[in-house]
Design a protein with these regions (language model features):
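Active-site-proximal specificity loops/subdomain of glycosyltransferases
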Residues: 50-94
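Short internal beta-strands
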Residues: 33-40, 126-128
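Conserved donor-nucleotide/metal-binding helix-loop-beta segment in metal-dependent transferases, i.e.
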Residues: 108-144
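Short aromatic/hydrophobic "clamp" motif used to bind/position activated sugar donors
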Residues: 99
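N-proximal low-complexity "stem/linker" segments adjacent to membrane-targeting elements
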Residues: 1-21
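Short, acidic, metal-binding catalytic loop of nucleotide-sugar glycosyltransferases
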Residues: 23-31
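The conserved acidic donor/metal-binding loop of glycosyltransferases
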Residues: 103-107
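A conserved mid-domain beta-alpha-beta active-site/ligand-binding segment of alpha/beta enzyme cores
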Residues: 149-160
Length: 160
């Protein structure tokens, strides 16, 4: 079973990507890490992260392009202005069996890969920062409350 990390980046966010990779490698020198290119402007960040931190480019760029094109056709531009933002969904079709997806505006302060051990208890987990003062606005549509998809008690756990 192959475990590892996916990131999405391009040359524009290279400094953030370097900071993220520096923090990951501080605690774990060997975990496989794959870069999913945000767009065609990724060669410099790929070369730099490959040289400094042994990051590999996502192995199926044709699939990535097809996925992006399909997402762009499915979702109206009023809903999703940049289909490339959904390239992160390619993680489900990549070479890793168990994985973390980490945004490049993050730094870690522990061996983040140890969190993959939770997959022995659950099939999926998500950790994301959302300002609690915004309540559900940035996470769920009010529809989930109105239709009782989640109870108020269940939603309280979102801001643990």
């Amino acid at each position: 079973m192959m475990r590892g990390i996916y990131i999405v980046a391009n040359d524009r966010v290279m400094e953030n990507a370097i900071a993220l990779l520096n923090s990951i490698r501080c605690y774990n020198k060997t975990v496989p890490i794959f870069l999913i290119p945000f767009n065609e402007d990724y060669h410099q960040v790929a070369e730099t992260l490959g040289r400094l931190h042994d990051v590999k480019v996502f192995p199926d760029l044709d699939f990535l392009e097809q996925l992006t094109q399909q997402i762009g056709e499915i979702f109206d531009r009023d809903f999703l202005k940049l289909p490339n933002k959904m390239r992160k969904l390619a993680v489900w079709f990549g070479p890793l069996d168990e994985f973390l997806y980490i945004d490049t505006d993050i730094v870690v302060f522990e061996d983040i890969v140890a969190n993959l051990d939770y997959l022995s208890e659950v099939g999926f987990f998500c950790c994301d920062y959302h300002f609690s003062g915004q309540k559900l606005r940035n996470i769920f549509s009010p529809f989930v409350v109105e239709q009782n998809i989640f109870t108020e008690k269940e939603l309280e756990d979102v801001f643990n």
